[in-house]
Amino acid sequence: MWKLWRAEEGAAALGGALFLLLFALGVRQLLKQRRPMGFPPGPPGLPFIGNIYSLAASSELPHVYMRKQSQVYGEIFSLDLGGISTVVLNGYDVVKECLVHQSEIFADRPCLPLFMKMTKMGGLLNSRYGRGWVDHRRLAVNSFRYFGYGQKSFESKILEETKFFNDAIETYKGRPFDFKQLITNAVSNITNLIIFGERFTYEDTDFQHMIELFSENVELAASASVFLYNAFPWIGILPFGKHQQLFRNAAVVYDFLSRLIEKASVNRKPQLPQHFVDAYLDEMDQGKNDPSSTFSKENLIFSVGELIIAGTETTTNVLRWAILFMALYPNIQGQVQKEIDLIMGPNGKPSWDDKCKMPYTEAVLHEVLRFCNIVPLGIFHATSEDAVVRGYSIPKGTTVITNLYSVHFDEKYWRDPEVFHPERFLDSSGYFAKKEALVPFSLGRRHCLGEHLARMEMFLFFTALLQRFHLHFPHELVPDLKPRLGMTLQPQPYLICAERR
């Protein structure tokens, strides 16, 4: 009897302790969800999970949902992502005010559990604003220039890849097929030349598998499961959930990248770099005795992975959308081909120098960038110190989302933004007219370092393709135009026929 009583007493004590722990955690979570003084207003959220449910349950994509909330709460409003205080910037004016006029304050990255797990806040894309990021970005920018677009010969390498690409399309002989794999392989090879000094064949199944895992992770990163993991990282102990699939994919990718890096460095000659990996290893050698150096084997793997996915995912999806819209609007396709024939000739070699002579083609590509919003919410920013924007107080460490979709559909700068209309980028004389409010590569200190290369790839692949082929849907079957949800917006899978002109 005494033992039974002692057991019951122990169980009661344990239950009481557990209750107090859960109560304390609940109070802590609710306190985290309180808006600070002077913080921007926003939609009400649920206890504990805040606005995560609203985002997940909405019938609209997150960037559309956020733009509609801005019509209620203003261009700058707040969301509670499970205790993660978040500010959303909408419209060109407020995005420019923060990323350009207060660029240093808004150049940080949030310390989200996902980033901590994936890259330990190292590498390049998700690293904190400071010396490590400055050093890595400097090296990446110099490498893209020195081993890539800064060399006149690099354009010929892109054109060589466009020939491989077009020859592969030719094998389908006008039969319907999905462009995705071919475009992904071709575009990634341009980045591979800079990073590893070599391209991979379209039959390399190992490399294709890595790219597929990258692409899957881009979708998984925008899932409700990942938002919940960021809010409650302890759910990482559970063996299921999309965040777990993301981590498994990342482990496979990092292992494969490690082997690629080892292979690329076999014939390395110190201080005579031939590609990004060589240059990074030189930086590691120079920083061996510097305890503050952030160049490491681990950060090399993270940086290589980020450069590949950033250089592949966005450009691939721009071209996939461009192909879709050419088939959807044959009159626009015809006008582009007419300009190509006039400037390049039906059999001439495409040239980057021809871009300034082809205003309509330029207008079409820019309208694809605006209308399709490849990275609608950009990469999340964070404040490196307390900030004041439009009279609102934004504390240091606040997560900041830049709704680039709202910029590209801002009626203050775009007439009829819901309409695909390339002519908006032409002036009254038919010349290309650059628009200030087109910012697909973001703004400020964290703007995309590969913008110049991406624009070169888009132009050369697009013109080389339309120079040789006429594009149309099989049996006039128009695909669903609603994009797939992810960190990037890619088209739904679709088939296309490419017939030799």
UniProtKB/Swiss-Prot annotation:
Annotated binding of heme, by residue: C448
Biological process (GO), any one: response to ionizing radiation
The entry's keywords: Disease variant, Endoplasmic reticulum, Heme, Iron, Lipid metabolism, Membrane, Metal-binding, Microsome, Monooxygenase, Oxidoreductase, Signal
Catalysed conversion reaction: calciol + reduced [NADPH--hemoprotein reductase] + O2 = calcidiol + oxidized [NADPH--hemoprotein reductase] + H2O + H(+); vitamin D2 + reduced [NADPH--hemoprotein reductase] + O2 = 25-hydroxyvitamin D2 + oxidized [NADPH--hemoprotein reductase] + H2O + H(+); 1alpha-hydroxyvitamin D2 + reduced [NADPH--hemoprotein reductase] + O2 = 1alpha,25-dihydroxyvitamin D2 + oxidized [NADPH--hemoprotein reductase] + H2O + H(+); alfacalcidol + reduced [NADPH--hemoprotein reductase] + O2 = calcitriol + oxidized [NADPH--hemoprotein reductase] + H2O + H(+)
Single GO MF descriptor: iron ion binding
Pathway: Hormone biosynthesis; vitamin D biosynthesis
Compartments in which it is found: Endoplasmic reticulum membrane; Microsome membrane
Cofactor: heme
Enzyme Commission code: 1.14.14.24
One of the record's GO cellular component terms: cytoplasm
A Pfam family it matches: p450
InterPro entries with a match to the protein in the record: Cyt_P450, Cyt_P450_CS, Cyt_P450_E_grp-I, Cyt_P450_sf, Cytochrome_P450_fam2
Signal peptide start-end: 1-26
PROSITE patterns per record: CYTOCHROME_P450
UniProt disease link: Rickets vitamin D-dependent 1B: An autosomal recessive disorder caused by a selective deficiency of the active form of vitamin D (1,25-dihydroxyvitamin D3) and resulting in defective bone mineralization and clinical features of rickets. The patients sera have low calcium concentrations, low phosphate concentrations, elevated alkaline phosphatase activity and low levels of 25-hydroxyvitamin D.
Subunit structure: Homodimer.
Functional description taken from the UniProt entry: A cytochrome P450 monooxygenase involved in activation of vitamin D precursors. Can metabolize vitamin D analogs/prodrugs 1alpha-hydroxyvitamin D(2) (doxercalciferol) and 1alpha-hydroxyvitamin D(3) (alfacalcidol) forming 25-hydroxy derivatives. Mechanistically, uses molecular oxygen inserting one oxygen atom into a substrate, and reducing the second into a water molecule, with two electrons provided by NADPH via cytochrome P450 reductase (CPR; NADPH-ferrihemoprotein reductase).
Record-stated family: Belongs to the cytochrome P450 family.
Protein name in the entry: Vitamin D 25-hydroxylase
Gene: CYP2R1
